[in-house]
Design a protein with these regions (language model features):
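A cross-family phosphate/adenosyl-ligand binding-site feature
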Residues: 1-234
Length: 234
């Protein structure tokens, strides 16, 4: 049975033992995709940040907290998968330093002109999908070559949707990218558009996340079938 990897939910980047940076991702789309993939006959492993939603019983779930932990788990699991869907919303930045004790007002830099403002130094976290994209096995017509892997990313954009999404697709070496908007965050419905590497819109899907997930899995299967037909070894 072919196995796919799904990243899901937010991540947390702690400032101290109490406070952390995060976002409003609920993990609902990841859970819906996991169920849809199981229904389609895939074996499913989910790498999930902290969420309240329940994943389907048939899926293996690997719980993580930080972006670094999510990347490590995904990189370990991806080699045994035929593809991966990046439905998670990992934090893009982490604090430069994590305090061992709850921070006080004097623990961050204040300038004389700050008027009570704190300066929080952040560093970029690793890009999980780009890391997977850099290691994925490409599809090949060579019958002796290992089977290829596919990669599908999500892109939440508020402007220049196509341009920004395609830039992400290319930078992360993905095969498809799913463009959604902020209204889907922490909601039960979603409005998405699937783009391929040429910028062509393969589908526009709206509705309950359960239904959207089923359509997404079907579109991915159709894409992979077409790619496989062009590469008989996979």
């Amino acid at each position: 049975m072919a196995k796919i990897l799904i990243t899901s939910g937010p991540t947390r980047q702690y400032l101290d033992p109490i406070r952390y940076l995060t976002n409003a991702s609920s993990g609902r789309m990841g859970a819906a995709l996991a169920q849809a993939a199981l229904d389609a006959g895939f074996e499913v492993v989910v790498v999930s940040g902290p969420v309240d939603v329940k994943y389907p019983n048939g899926a293996r779930v690997v719980d993580v907290v930080s972006t670094e932990e999510m990347r490590t788990a995904a990189m370990q699991l991806f080699p045994e998968c035929v593809g991966a869907i990046g439905a998670a919303a990992p934090c893009d930045y982490r604090p430069d330093a994590v305090l061992t004790d709850k921070m006080s007002k004097n623990d961050f830099i204040r300038s004389p002109e700050a008027n009570g403002e704190l300066l929080l130094r952040l560093r970029e976290t690793p890009d999980i999908m780009a890391s997977l994209g850099a290691t994925k096995r490409e599809f090949s017509p060579d019958p002796t070559a290992p089977s290829g892997q596919w990669l599908v990313a999500f892109a939440l954009e508020t402007s220049d949707h196509h341009v920004r999404a395609l830039q992400k697709l290319q930078r992360k070496h993905c095969d498809l990218i799913v463009v959604n908007d902020p209204t889907s965050i922490n909601g039960t419905t979603s409005n998405v558009e699937i783009l391929d590497a040429t910028g062509e819109t393969l589908a526009q899907i709206s509705g309950d996340k359960t239904d959207v997930a089923r359509r997404l899995i079907a579109e991915i299967q159709a894409f992979v079938a077409k790619r496989t037909a062009a590469s008989p070894s996979v």
